[in-house]
A protein has these predicted regions:
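Catalytic core of membrane glycerolipid acyltransferases/transacylases, capturing the structured
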Residues: 4-56
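Non-catalytic C-terminal accessory region of glycerolipid acyltransferases
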Residues: 60-190
Length: 190
């Protein structure tokens, strides 16, 4: 399981897909369902439903089942545990990575998979941060601008060492605490 922070949105997934694809092709990225309709990349995606979607609970259970089956077959799962792009709390503040979802801890613990943390540096533009404070629709519209803007910039994610399973196992009784630890560990990579 590869866990990563999510400061840029779509760009983060594109970079991880490129890096992993150089080594192996049995990876799947947990991503919003609107991205899974692109035929050329469909095989590398597992859709994560938006909470407001019809049958969101059923779709969420299906997503978890697919992810666990893929892991049990020896595949790689890529997940952005915050589930959202990092954003500033004010118009001019720094982007902050949201709390990480305890579902990731449960998936890690149930699967027994090796965990590799990845940290992306930087953040989306100030325009994006301001749009985020004004309107979700405006924010979403600017995400494509951010992708185009990022294409011409070098990206250098920091890939951490695989985590010692005993460190994760020591936190098995507290999934939320496990994710706080894993988030801090990932954001601390340098």
């Amino acid at each position: 399981i590869i866990v990563a922070n999510h400061p840029h949105g779509l760009v983060d997934g594109m970079i991880l897909a490129d890096l992993i694809g150089r080594v192996r092709t049995d990876y799947k990225i947990l991503t919003r369902s609107l991205l899974t309709d692109v035929e050329e990349i469909q095989q590398f995606m597992i859709p994560v439903p938006f909470p407001h979607e019809d049958d969101a609970l059923k779709k969420n259970l299906d997503m978890r089942k697919q992810a666990m089956a893929h892991l049990s077959n020896g595949g790689v799962i890529v997940i952005f545990p915050s589930g959202v792009v990092a954003s500033s709390e004010t118009m001019f503040g720094p982007a902050i990575e949201a709390e990480w979802n305890p579902f990731t801890a449960k998936m890690i613990l149930r699967s027994g998979a090796t965990v590799v943390p990845v940290r992306f540096t930087g953040q989306n533009s100030r325009w994006y941060q301001m749009a985020n404070r004004i309107s979700p629709a405006l924010r979403q519209g600017l995400l494509l601008h951010e992708v185009v803007h990022a294409v011409n910039k070098p990206q250098a994610p920091i890939v951490g060492e695989p985590l010692d399973p005993s460190e994760i196992d020591a936190r098995k009784d507290n999934p939320r605490g496990c994710m706080e630890w894993l988030r801090a560990r990932t954001l601390g990579l340098s």
